[in-house]
Amino acid sequence: MGRVSAWEALLLGVVEGLTEFLPVSSTGHLTLLFHLLGLPVEEDPFLKTFLVAIQLGAILAVLLLYGRRLAADRALWLRIAVAFVPTGVIGFFFYPLIKGVILGNDAVVAFFLFFVGAVLLFADRLAERAQYQDVKALPLARVAWIGVFQGLAALFPGTSRSGATILGGLLLGLNRQAAAEFSFLLALPTMFAAVGYDLWKSAPEVPEGGWSLLLLGFLAALATALVTVRWMLAFVARHGFRPFALYRMALAAVYAFFFLR
């Protein structure tokens, strides 16, 4: 079952809940944290299952916060579906081709942490003149392009799913809050599909005593994500995405220090 302890499970769940919906790359943070804790995530099947469990906890937070709104808003569901289609197509056709080439490549992670941060700085300035205050006003062709951004994020580690979708929303004319909210909502079909399948496939391999650690990490991620999603909307309304962009660029340097020496 690896060497993960209860406090490590709690810490990892909190970090996932904090970073999954911020444009800072949750994968980059978790990879760095696993390294600092000395946990061999690439070699331990249980740790891979644990990662899936905490991601599921984080995405459930969005469903709890937006479930009622989604149930009554078909126009919003249409846009989620339109954006999800190119994401699925890109993932289906291209992910298997590059999986063994760049996934797990630390230089690629460091580069995209920095690159997306730099582009996010530019896009955040565009948001000051945003044309659309609600994703339902965004033309469907532009909505589909946000899905393309999300699909590309799955191909290039360090990009960040939320970072890519927020960046796409800003570049395509959404204001900051609308871009952030649509990023949250677009995570629902994308992550539930991927995470649910992975968890179902790996559940029989969970050893005795492992379920309590999975539950601890799941609940920690859920609780933290509930707070983070609410906080982020208020934060970007006041400060924009510039602080996140600068943070990404600094994190790229830290990541390179630990993994590229």
Swiss-Prot record:
Its main location: membrane. It catalyses: di-trans,octa-cis-undecaprenyl diphosphate + H2O = di-trans,octa-cis-undecaprenyl phosphate + phosphate + H(+). Its EC number is 3.6.1.27. Signal peptide: none annotated. One of its GO terms (molecular function) is undecaprenyl-diphosphatase activity. GO terms for biological process: cell wall organization; peptidoglycan biosynthetic process; regulation of cell shape; response to antibiotic. The chain crosses the membrane at residues 9-31, 46-66, 80-100, 102-122, 137-157, 180-200, 209-229, 240-260. One of its GO terms (cellular component) is plasma membrane. It is a multi-pass membrane protein. The keyword Repressor does not apply. InterPro entries: UppP. The keyword Membrane applies. Keywords: Antibiotic resistance, Cell inner membrane, Cell membrane, Cell shape, Cell wall biogenesis/degradation, Hydrolase, Membrane, Peptidoglycan synthesis, Transmembrane, Transmembrane helix. It is found in: Cell inner membrane. It is an enzyme of class 3 (hydrolase). PANTHER family: UNDECAPRENYL-DIPHOSPHATASE. Belongs to the UppP family. Bacitracin is thought to be involved in the inhibition of peptidoglycan synthesis by sequestering undecaprenyl diphosphate, thereby reducing the pool of lipid carrier available. Catalyzes the dephosphorylation of undecaprenyl diphosphate (UPP). Confers resistance to bacitracin. This is Undecaprenyl-diphosphatase. The gene is uppP.
